[in-house]
Amino acid sequence: MGAAVLGCLYSVKGSWCSGLSHVTLAREGVREETMDTKKLIGAIVAAFVILFIAGFLVHSVWLGTTYRQMRDAGFSFRPEEAMRHKLWGVWVSDALYSILFVWVYAKGKEEKPWVGQGIRYGILMTLFTVVPSALNDYVVYNLPHTLVLHWIVAGLITLILMGLAAAAILKKPSAA
């Protein structure tokens, strides 16, 4: 029997406190697991880097021509210079998404192989976040259906990569 208070794990036989080196995750007293905060932060950073790089590759490289054609046809986008000045919003959004993405994974991971968990989690999060957002944008804005499909496919690939990274970093070390 144990309890966690301010990052310290207390049990009947004594206490163990690691300051900020571990985070205690508990599920209604069913199971307690101590997770290395460095791994959690590492997974968040990896997810952020994947999300940011994928965003650049998808929107600037892969779909850049599509967006220019839409602008030339009269679709309302901010001028590129104005978007660059608001890039901080993308960083904040990507950071928040990465933190929550990894935190939810860490809270719900199971004692199963990490590769399958990472892939399943990426698919689940795509269905939970990317697909509804893309379909709502398709309904509200005059968007080509191919663009929406590209967003969904790119989101699926990105979130699977993020899921694999989080699962790989947060997996328990194998017993030697």
Please name every model-derived segment.
Residues 31-176:
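Juxtamembrane/disordered regions of integral membrane proteins
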